[in-house]
From Swiss-Prot:
Ribonucleoprotein recorded as keyword: no
Cross-link position per record: Glycyl lysine isopeptide (Lys-Gly) (interchain with G-Cter in SUMO2): 146, 225, 238, 309, 369, 381
Oligomer status and interactors: eIF4F is a multi-subunit complex, the composition of which varies with external and internal environmental conditions. It is composed of at least EIF4A, EIF4E and EIF4G1/EIF4G3. Interacts with PAIP1, EIF4E and UPF2. Found in a complex with XPO7, EIF4A1, ARHGAP1, VPS26A, VPS29, VPS35 and SFN. May interact with NOM1. Interacts with PDCD4; this interferes with the interaction between EIF4A and EIF4G. Interacts with RBM4. Interacts with DDX3X in an RNA-independent manner.
Motif (Q motif): 32-60
Residues modified to Phosphoserine: 4
Major localization class: cytoplasm
Name of the protein described by the UniProt record: Eukaryotic initiation factor 4A-I
Domain of life: Eukaryota
Top EC class, one word: hydrolase
InterPro entries: DEAD/DEAH_box_helicase_dom (IPR011545), EIF4A_DEADc (IPR044728), Helicase_ATP-bd (IPR014001), Helicase_C-like (IPR001650), P-loop_NTPase (IPR027417), RNA-helicase_DEAD-box_CS (IPR000629), RNA_helicase_DEAD_Q_motif (IPR014014)
GO aspect biological process, one term: positive regulation of transcription by RNA polymerase II
């Protein structure tokens, strides 16, 4: 059933998700049931089997224009169902009888690409759709064989490997009709902008373009003008972007060298189901992990210097719960859905304030409550105030009873 945009409903999504911030949109159709989206029966079965009951606010607004073929810029908080928004749209549009790649999804990290692939496969479970993760760090020959022998309906990948496969003509753009950029702010930042543009040049001029992300600074919106045609905009106001359901605190540590003792004190105070500790450099991740192990605290480490197999093992252990604390760089801050994470510790405040929401979004996804604790030295106080202003939020000093909140 559709309603006008003016009603600006704040319905709960799957699993009692907290209401999302009001979405600003130039699209006036809100469809509050998957049954009313004219989706195929087999796709609907996959959606309900996956555990969705009702579309989240972003899904109510963005799925329909995506299916209708419009270029779409969709913005919503982490954990509100952005991945399923484009996965459902792709699965509805592909022709299963056509054994050719028809949709291309790009993600900034290998882990996120693999997670998107899993969501697509799960939602399309009853359709027989094929989806392949085309990522760096894996065997090129096996990749080429897969693309040539099978031509999967959907490719999810990282920019470097995808461009390589397109450039060497192992991946054909001939039938690609939908191009999705997930975590678009990261993808279009300095590191990936040129690669994205090169990939886009190889696609058909009438290819539909969909961008999704939690943050979309104005310079990114400028870049989208280069390769999007009158896009539908579905945006959350900036001041409503910080996550509801996440309690945010800071600990005053004055000096950098006191952070380690403070972290160990926290460990002893809290019963942690699962936690992610964010640090700004790879070298410091290794340093902190060693220091924690020396003090008999268990923790796993993950960063971009590790090879893909090692990263896969660490993520598997963390997802299964056999490892409870993960120390990482911003590599993990982009959309990795680890359901049990109740606590995020920013050992270092992010150097880019827009990464803050990606980091603390690890706790409280789909309405699960979470706590974020920021370790703040004298030098960090200005950065903390800057984050508070940017997100129009309040980060309070950590109370003594923090253990009761996790």
């Amino acid at each position: 059933m559709s309603a006008s945009q003016d009603s600006r409903s704040r319905d709960n999504g799957p699993d009692g998700m907290e209401p999302e911030g009001v979405i600003e949109s130039n699209w006036n159709e809100i469809v509050d049931s998957f049954d009313d989206m004219n989706l195929s029966e087999s796709l609907l079965r996959g959606i309900y089997a996956y555990g969705f009951e009702k579309p989240s606010a972003i899904q109510q607004r963005a799925i329909l224009p995506c299916i209708k073929g419009y270029d779409v810029i969709a913005q919503a908080q982490s954990g509100t169902g952005k991945t399923a928004t484009f996965a459902i749209s792709i699965l509805q549009q592909i022709e299963l009888d056509l054994k050719a790649t028809q949709a291309l999804v790009l993600a900034p990290t290998r882990e996120l690409a693999q997670q998107i692939q899993k969501v697509v496969m799960a939602l399309g479970d009853y359709m027989g759709a094929s989806c392949h993760a085309c990522i760096g760090g894996t065997n090129v020959r096996a990749e080429v064989q897969k693309l040539q022998m099978e031509a999967p309906h959907i490719i999810v990948g990282t920019p470097g490997r995808v461009f390589d496969m397109l450039n060497r003509r192992y991946l054909s753009p001939k039938y690609i009709k939908m191009f999705v950029l997930d975590e678009a702010d990261e993808m279009l930042s300095r590191g990936f902008k040129d690669q994205i543009y090169d990939i886009f040049q190889k696609l058909n001029s009438n290819t539909q373009v969909v961008l999704l992300s939690a943050t979309m600074p104005s310079d990114v919106l400028e870049v989208t003008k280069k390769f999007m045609r009158d896009p539908i905009r579905i945006l959350v106001k900036k001041e409503e972007l910080t996550l509801e359901g996440i309690r945010q605190f800071y600990i005053n540590v004055e000096r950098e060298e006191w952070k380690l003792d403070t972290l160990c004190d926290l460990y002893e105070t809290l019963t942690i189901t699962q936690a992610v500790i964010f640090i700004n450099t790879r070298r410091k991740v290794d340093w902190l992990t060693e220091k924690m192990h020396a003090r008999d605290f268990t923790a796993s480490a993950m960063h971009g210097d590790m090879d893909q197999k090692e990263r896969d093992v660490i993520m598997r252990e963390f997802r299964s719960g056999s490892s409870r604390v993960l120390i990482t760089t911003d590599l993990l801050a982009r959309g990795i859905d680890v359901q049990q994470v109740s606590l995020v510790i920013n050992y270092d405040l992010p150097t880019n304030r827009e990464n803050y929401i990606h980091r603390i979004g690890r706790g409280g996804r789909f309405g699960r409550k979470g706590v974020a604790i920021n370790m703040v030295t004298e030098e960090d106080k200005r950065t903390l105030r800057d984050i508070e202003t940017f997100y129009n939020t309040s980060i309070e000093e950590m109370p003594l009873n923090v253990a009761d909140l996790i």
